[in-house]
Regions:
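Periplasmic/cell-envelope proteins involved in peptidoglycan metabolism and beta-lactam response
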Residues: 1-222, 313-323, 471-473, 478-510, ...
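Beta-lactam-recognizing serine transpeptidase/beta-lactamase-like catalytic domain environment
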Residues: 198, 202-243, 248-474, 481, ...
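A short, charged, Gly/Pro-tolerant segment at domain boundaries
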Residues: 514-515
Length: 531
């Protein structure tokens, strides 16, 4: 029901002098939308006082004169005098109250000026405008409030709470968020990547302290932003993780007791698996490697040999135990569960691709959640972005503390002596894994010439506090995750550890010359498509 104040001199003080008080109180009571606030107290989304100009067309004596006066007073807020004149000519189609909205979200001062015009048939009511004070910072995570509904992110997920006037506090910290966004932008630009994404997570409980994509967008200009940049790809877009998945294969074999950290494997640089020849990323002579050495050098062949010791059925069981193939339960909407092919649907070559992160899909959020379990002693975490969902209750056990400790040590060696050398941080032990994953060409169903390069890791290695994931999509100037993504990880994780005052656990860091860049082996011949 639309009510308007009768055009009577007795009511004029209400529409003029009292208007300022009405507008000031409009968003402060229980009916005003709550703010979205960062963990460090910054308002990332807030509702500001405003006014709404409403016309009752049948009461307007001279629409042309009224339109001219409103256009001069409102400026760009309502359009030209001609556009306003059309609004004054008749009620909105289907509006039972016989009124027309001339302008919404009008600045309080302009709203007061409209009221002072004293135009018959024109009234001003309290309104509010949603604004995003930090511009593009964490745009996809925050989401957007439109005229009729909320779109994506926290705005949509916590719409009912916000509509009730309650603030929503995030686990996100704007300082870490800015550092992450800068690092992603620089990595994508330096290596001519199509896009980049990343996150920083507390390994103890899955609290997300930063989450970003590039290119990003500003929710203050939501309508102008391309649709493809508005998606929170960290939870909506699954991909084949490549070598960042190998630690889960190793953890499964260790947990099931089919290998020990002292076992050795004779690892060649290629091996046939059914109708596919699997090759390592670099040509090398046959070598004797422990499971840790296999991870250190990111050997495809060695990882498959470990997986064959375990068997496909038990491998799938362990993969599912880490949460792959199902939603993580993050407190955001739109999450994709990814795909883990059931063992019954495996082909003969599946044991040659799934252990090395091909032939299955995961979201970046699932990968981070799984790595948190590797890091924190083997407990599942539920990723979350708001303190409303914060929980200190331990999750179910995924792997034993012993297996977690062994894998942490292996991943530290990856950084200290292996492919992750560019992720070293002075003063800290760091554990992590590089990834260079081939992308499937959607037109052919076969692997194409584009890659996702990534690095995921945590620190300090033996008592992890935070993990970070960096992924760059389709870099053109370099191929390897150790070159493209690891330096960005180093910057972000180094900042995070210092910002949260995590005590150093190492004097200096290893400063040996890094291993030479790998020599790309000939492409493996792939006879069947990956579905």
């Amino acid at each position: 029901v639309q009510l308007s104040v009768a055009e009577d001199a007795r009511y004029r003080p209400f529409t003029t002098e009292a208007l300022a008080s009405e507008l000031a109180d409009a968003t402060k009571g229980e009916t005003g939308r709550g703010a979205i606030v960062s963990a460090d107290g910054r308002r990332l989304a807030a509702s500001l006082d405003a006014g709404k100009v409403i016309a009752t067309p049948y009461q307007i004596e001279d629409p042309g004169a009224a339109a001219a006066a409103l256009a001069e007073t409102l400026g760009d807020a309502a359009g030209s005098a001609g556009e306003i004149r059309e609004k004054l000519a008749g009620a909105n189609e289907g509006a039972t109250g016989g009124y027309s909205v001339v302008a919404e979200g009008v600045e309080p001062e302009r709203a007061r000026e409209v009221s002072k015009l004293g135009l018959t048939g024109i009234s001003v009511t309290p309104d509010e405008v949603r604004t995003y004070p930090n511009g593009p910072l964490a745009g996809q995570l925050i989401g957007y409030l439109g005229t009729d509904q909320a779109y994506g992110g926290v705005e949509a997920r916590y719409d009912e709470i916000l509509k009730g006037g309650q603030d929503v506090e995030l686990t996100l910290d704007t300082a870490v968020q800015r550092e992450l966004e800068v690092a992603l932008t620089e990595a994508a630009e330096e290596y001519d990547g199509k896009s980049a994404l990343g996150l920083v997570m507390r390994v103890e409980d899955g609290a997300i302290v930063a989450l970003a994509h590039t290119p990003g967008y500003d929710n203050n200009q939501f309508a102008e932003a391309p649709e493809e940049v508005k998606r929170n790809r960290i939870l909506t877009d699954p991909y084949e993780p490549g070598s960042t998945f190998k630690p889960f294969t190793m953890a499964a074999a260790l947990e099931e007791g089919v290998v020990s950290e002292q076992d050795t494997f004779m690892v060649a640089d290629s091996m046939p698996v059914a109708d596919v020849v699997i090759q390592d990323s670099e040509a090398h002579a046959p070598e004797v490697l422990t499971p840790g050495g296999i991870l250190q050098h990111s050997r495809n062949v060695g990882t498959i040999q470990v997986a064959q010791s375990l068997g496909g059925e038990r491998l799938v069981e362990n993969i599912k135990r880490f949460g792959f193939g199902e939603e993580t339960g993050v407190d955001l909407w739109g999450e994709n569960a990814g795909i883990v092919p059931p063992f019954e649907e495996w082909s003969g070559s599946s044991i040659g691709n799934i252990p090395i992160g091909q032939g299955l899909t995961v979201t970046p959020l699932q990968l981070a959640s799984g790595f948190a379990s590797l890091a924190n002693g083997g407990l599942q975490v539920t990723p979350h972005v708001t303190s409303n969902a914060d929980t200190r209750e331990p999750g179910r056990r995924v792997i034993s503390e012993k297996t977690s400790s062994i894998v942490r040590g292996m991943l530290q060696t990856v950084v200290d002596e292996g492919t992750g050398h560019f992720a070293r941080i002075p003063g800290y032990t760091v554990a992590g894994k590089t990834g260079t994953a081939q992308k499937v060409d959607p037109e052919t169903g076969f692997y194409g010439d584009e890659y996702v390069t990534s690095f995921i890791g945590f620190a300090p290695a033996h008592d992890p506090k935070y993990l970070a994931l960096i992924a760059v999509d389709e870099p053109q100037k370099a191929l390897w995750g150790e070159v493209v993504a690891a330096p960005a990880f180093q910057n972000v994780m180094g900042f995070t550890l210092g910002y949260y005052n995590v005590p150093p656990d190492r004097e200096g860091t290893k400063n040996d010359d890094p291993p030479p860049d790998p020599v790309l082996a000939p492409d493996a011949k792939k006879e069947d498509s990956i579905r």
